Amino acid sequence: MSNFFRDSSMGFKPRPNIFAKLRVRDVDSDSSANTVVENSSNCLDVGSSIEGDDTFKKPHKTSTEQELITSMSLSQRNHGYSDDMEIGSPKKTTSTDQYNRILKNDVAAIENDTDEDFEITEVREVSEGVAKETKESHGDPNDSETTLKDSKMHEYTMTNGKAPLHTSINNSSTSSNDVLLEAFTNTQRICSNLKQELQKQQQDNAKLKVRLQSYASNSDKINEKVGKYKSCLETLQERIATLTSHKNNQETKLKDLRQNHQLYQRRISGFKTSIENLNKTINDLGKNKKEADAELMKKGKEIEYLKRELDDCSGQLSEEKIKNSSLIQEMGKNREEMIKSIENFFSEDKAHHLLQFNKFEERVHDLFEKKLQKHFDVAKDTLNVGLRNTTVELSSNTETMLKQQYEDIKENLEQKMSSSKDEMAKTINELSVTQKGLIMGVQEELLTSSGNIQTALVSEMNNTRQELLDDASQTAKNYASLENLVKAYKAEIVQSNEYEERIKHLESERSTLSSQKNQIISSLGTKEAQYEDLVKKLEAKNIEISQISGKEQSLTEKNENLSNELKKVQDQLEKLNNLNITTKSNYENKISSQNEIVKALVSENDTLKQRIQQLVEIKENEQKDHTTKLEAFQKNNEQLQKLNVEVVQLKAHELELEEQNRHLKNCLEKKETGVEESLSDVKTLKQQVIVLKSEKQDITAEKLELQDNLESLEEVTKNLQQKVQSQKRELEQKIKELEEIKNHKRNEPSKKGTQNFTKPSDSPKKNATTSNLFPNNSAAIHSPMKKCPKVDHISKSRINSSKETSKFNDEFDLSSSSNDDLELTNPSPIQIKPVRGKIKKGSNCMKPPISSRKKLLLVEDEDQSLKISKKRRRK
């Protein structure tokens, strides 16, 4: 459109100057300016009233401050707490309702004025469309962007549609130049509004990017915290598993200890019974030992008596041997004498002498036989009687006594040894392997001692046998000498057969006697050997009894040691039972406390999972909202209340975290009681304390960040208030300057109007509301005509100030319509209805010249200031 109006190739008919008509309409524009000023003052009053109803009850917080809070706080939780915000902020809703009512009243008053002036049905249809948009915005907040666009299109059609209506009514007075100029101004305003919307949307995009970044950082922090909590839960689960395994191991150990204790008690009872039996057997053995000692004393006395008798018999035998030797010597002497006498006799008278010699020899032989027979008979009788008596007595007494004693002792010892062996075997098997070794050593010693005894007995038997053989050899030698003598005598007495027969008979008797003697000697040797065996056996038994007594003493000592060990083991078992009870109670307390901790952590984990799900849902919703919020303006105002509620909830969450910290501190104090018993538990608890401290530091850091953000917001609000005041002052100064400029421009309206009409200027974003308040009146065209060189400087300063304010007001210049439920927002420049001035039919319209084909865009601030200055001047 602008190129169309600026095209110099297209020719137009010469028109009258339109600025003359604008001068005529100054009176009508003053009244409209008054209404605009009153509306702006009402809006300021409403803004001050809204500032008074702040949720945090702070005097310096405005709508801009709360919107900065929305940009700095967490925007991802908006959807989760929308219902709570609507319930928990009745003051805000009441203040916004009052503000919306005032706006609706102002808009209704303006619409009533326009309806009374023009009576156009299309304007009423536009108001109904706006009412429908308000209903739809209350019903569905997600469709607010489409309703805003529709309302903008209605306003644009309304502003664009009223010009041809005015022209149709005032065809007689107006011209096509007015219509074109009005359409041009409308297109210019539309362009400025579109630029403002583009800037706002760019700012919203920047805000949303910042919020997405903050949301991503917060989600990363939450994921880290969730990971920490998961690691804590895993460590706790591992610790619980180790504790349960340790508990099971201790229970198994306790069971084993109990079983071992019962086994030891049974063994101890068995040892006691075996020891009692051993004591009884030892007492019986002592009694039997005393009896055996008495019997052995008696037997020793009897053996000594028999030894004396044997000595007497041996003395008698030696005497007989001496007598035999003396007889043999006498017989030799007699033989020599007889030989001499016989030789003498034979030499004298051989025959006579031979007869006498034979007779004498017979007599001698008879005498010799008689004497020898007597001696042999006497010796034989004495020997036989003595030997028989001694042998019978010895054999009878010794055999009977020794057999009886031996059998009795043997039976007793066998019984006792069998019983003692059985008992000792049982005790030895039950006690230990060392006792078995001792018993085996004792048995080996007994075997060695018995072997030694047997060897000693064999040696003594051999000695006695050798002595008896020596005696027998001596007697045999004596008998051999006798045989030699007899043989010599036989040789000498060969002639006599009687002597030979007698000699044979004597030899037979001698052989029988020698055999009897040998039998007696052998029987004596056997009896002596038996006697010596019995003596040695008695000595061995005495040795065994002494060994048994030593063993008895050792067993008694072992019994005492075992009883002492039993007492010690019982004391240890009592200590172990006490320790078991204490450890059981401690572990039960620990397990109960850890179960409580686990429950608390599980509940926290569940809450965190729910929170994560909520955050995921919020993330999805935010991603959806990011696509829809590029053109939305009302939800940003709704986020104020939600984020305020979230701040309260964050404070409540901080209190909950403090309570959790207190609970964890109490749990740690409970756990510190068991530090001496389990050092590993202390380490894990210290790690948990460190983790909790780190979380607390994170929470305190977040608190400090929130406090810093609040302080920065307060500073920003103060700066904004100061800037608003400075802007008001600048506006007042500009109004004064514009009044002076108007006074100065009245003298030169035509020259400066043509110069300024060719200079287009872009309307700033901050003054969009004032441009919409003033309609397409002809009085608005005076502003470029009455401009002086100071106006450029003022417009530049105004643009710079608007840029500075736009830096701080990026997040706060949000549009608001009559259907907004939120408070603390600036009124939207699009939703406010423009006020049209009354167009008179009889007004003289000045047509522009042909040379002014390029039209100048109006500056809205200058237009408004000029109208206000005109109105004041006319008053």
Curated annotation (Swiss-Prot):
Gene Ontology biological process terms, A to Z: double-strand break repair via homologous recombination; homologous chromosome pairing at meiosis; homologous recombination; mitotic actomyosin contractile ring contraction; negative regulation of reciprocal meiotic recombination; positive regulation of protein sumoylation; positive regulation of strand invasion; protein localization to site of double-strand break
Molecular function as annotated in GO: actin filament binding; microfilament motor activity; SUMO polymer binding
Coiled-coil region: 177-333, 397-438, 456-752
Basic and acidic residues bias (residue ranges): 738-751
Domain of life: Eukaryota
Modified residues (Phosphoserine): 481
A GO CC term assigned to this protein in UniProt: myosin filament
Cystines in this chain: none
Subcellular location: Nucleus; Chromosome
Renumbered residue ranges of the record's region Disordered: 47-67, 127-152, 738-831
Gene3D superfamilies cross-referenced by the UniProt entry: 1.10.287.1490
Key words, A-Z: Chromosome, Coiled coil, Meiosis, Nucleus, Phosphoprotein
Compositionally biased spans, kind Polar residues: 752-780
Keyword Amino-acid biosynthesis found: no
N-terminal signal peptide: none
Function: Required for meiotic chromosome synapsis and cell cycle progression. May act as a molecular zipper to bring homologous chromosomes in close apposition. ZIP1 may encode the transverse filaments of the synaptonemal complex.
Note: Present with 391 molecules/cell in log phase SD medium.
Name of protein: Synaptonemal complex protein ZIP1
Protein's organism: Saccharomyces cerevisiae (strain ATCC 204508 / S288c) (Baker's yeast)
